[in-house]
Swiss-Prot record:
Catalytic activity reported: Endonucleolytic cleavage of RNA, removing 5'-extranucleotides from tRNA precursor
Cited SUPFAM superfamilies: PHP domain-like
Gene Ontology CC: cytoplasm; ribonuclease P complex
Biological role stated in the UniProt entry: Part of ribonuclease P, a protein complex that generates mature tRNA molecules by cleaving their 5'-ends.
Subunit structure comment from the entry: Consists of a catalytic RNA component and at least 4-5 protein subunits.
Name this protein carries in UniProt: Ribonuclease P protein component 3
InterPro entries cross-referenced by the UniProt entry: Pol/histidinol_Pase-like, RNase_P_comp-3_arc, RNase_P_p30
EC number in record: 3.1.26.5
Biological classification of the source: Archaea, Methanobacteriati, Methanobacteriota, Methanomada group, Methanococci
């Protein structure tokens, strides 16, 4: 069983991976955009991780407002990535993603919206299909004035919905270089300002649980969730 605290970011270079470890992370999900996917890049990041005793898993984020294109991309990249994310914002995309158990994380459901991108129905779908909601801390930090307050409000609203309906939530630094990397304590401290400490702890541990779940499903003896071949 995989344990520890894992960041979600866009860090693939050796210095970045060393920095993540020094800051206190147990591992990370290195995310590529689906239209820039390179097996060579993720393999080199995994090798850097092995060199420094740091777990690196592959992530692919699908970014499109076309639902058919999104579904095709999910099928294409599901077996290429450990963790599959879909960028949200469009309400039809948000809903469809939360209906799909082949997707692990709905990223930024509030993106470019005047609301938080979720309601109680969508939160229930995420809970039923084990699709997590992402809080992208990097996006919050990069925003200014009204946009920052709007994102923060969306985070708070989505946390309330997720907690009520037991929808998984992850928090990510979203870092693309060493200057964007944050320590686990920084993200935990932020979460403590918007929700209770016990729920913050649960959120910090959710990424490793998602990885563990996907690794389990990749086992040759597992046909589907709950159905496993047992050799006598």
């Amino acid at each position: 069983m995989l344990e520890g605290i894992f960041d979600i970011n866009h860090i693939f270079d050796e210095d970045g991976i060393k920095t993540l470890k020094r800051f206190g992370w147990d591992g990370s999900v290195a995310v590529q955009n689906h239209n820039e996917y390179s097996e060579e890049i993720i393999n080199s990041a995994v090798e850097y991780g092995e060199k420094h005793d740091f777990k690196v898993f592959s992530g692919v984020k699908i970014s499109t407002k076309n639902q058919n294109e999104m579904e095709k991309a999910v099928k294409k990249y599901r077996n290429k990535a450990d963790i599959l994310l879909v960028e949200g914002g469009d309400i039809k995309i948000n809903r469809r993603v939360l209906e799909m158990n082949d997707v692990d994380i709905l990223s930024t459901p509030e993106l470019n919206r005047m609301d938080n991108g979720l309601d109680h129905i969508l939160a229930r779908l995420g809970s039923t299909n084990r699709v997590a909601i992402e809080l992208n801390f990097g996006n919050l930090l990069k925003s200014r004035n009204y946009d920052r307050s709007k994102i923060l409000w969306a985070f708070q609203r989505n946390l309330k919905l997720a907690k009520k309906y037991d929808t998984p939530v992850v928090i990510s630094s979203g870092a693309s270089d060493i200057y964007g990397i944050k320590a686990p304590g920084d993200l935990r401290g932020f979460l403590n300002t918007v929700t209770d400490p016990l729920y913050s702890k649960k959120i910090m541990e959710t990424t490793s649980k998602i990885i563990d779940y996907r690794l389990y499903l990749k086992k040759d003896t597992v046909l589907t969730l709950g159905i496993e071949i047992v050799e006598e």
